Design a protein with these regions (language model features):
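Positively charged, amphipathic and often flexible ligand-engagement surfaces
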Residues: 1-211
């Protein structure tokens, strides 16, 4: 927070904090940091994630259910994307919505489309996924949605950099996380077929696949 107060000035968001919303204390921590940013008149940089250390963090610190984590993540995302509308003195926010969850990213996109339709100012929000994971989600975020006002969605892919020794713990976590990716396989497969159909402009591709 000291670095944010020093460098996140004049509307610039340079320094970000990561908030792991599977931790029970993260909602209160985020609210506290918002107050600090408002009082200190600096921008708050937020990278919002569900969490990556569930096998090593003490269990009592983590939400009891996945639904509780989902709720905490989504509520925090909505709060950060709307707090400037009702509170003119609210601090500027730079939000990185770092998620592989389709429901959460669609929720944010729909919220921002509604804000555009109503002529409301938008918070600074970008999306991020890990390189090699949830690529179909990254692609969908850059595509236009029919009958909706459009914004320029900025999507980032996070790439690990360093020697094998330096990155070993990171790589082990990603290997563990990839086990959960199997649960998304059917969704990913459908998304990739739809992307292929769109690029080749073959409306009957999926129909032929099912025959």
């Amino acid at each position: 927070m000291d670095l944010m107060q020093k460098y996140n000035r004049d509307g610039q968001t340079v320094v970000y904090n990561t908030y792991q919303m599977y931790l029970k204390e993260s909602t209160a921590t985020l609210e506290s940091h918002l107050r600090m940013a408002q009082e200190g008149k600096f921008s708050l940089g937020v990278k919002l994630v569900r969490g990556a250390y569930i096998n090593s963090d003490p269990r009592h610190l983590i939400h009891d259910t996945k639904e509780d984590t989902d709720r905490a993540f989504n509520n925090a995302a909505v709060m950060l994307a709307t707090q400037h509308i009702d509170n003119p003195s609210a601090p500027k926010i730079g939000l990185v919505l770092a998620s592989h969850n389709k429901e959460s990213t669609e929720m944010m996109r729909e919220l921002r489309q509604e804000q555009l339709r109503r002529g409301l100012p938008l918070a600074d929000v970008v999306y991020a996924q890990l390189m090699g994971m949830a690529d179909e989600l990254s692609m969908s975020l850059t595509q236009k949605v029919p009958d909706l006002e459009e914004e320029n969605n900025h999507v980032f892919k996070y790439v690990v950099w360093g020697t094998t020794q330096e990155c070993m713990m990171y790589l082990l976590r990603r290997a563990e996380e990839n086990r959960d990716a199997v649960e998304r396989s059917s969704v990913s497969k459908q998304a990739l077929w739809e992307e292929l159909r769109g690029r080749l402009t073959l409306p009957s591709l999926l129909d032929r696949r099912g025959s």
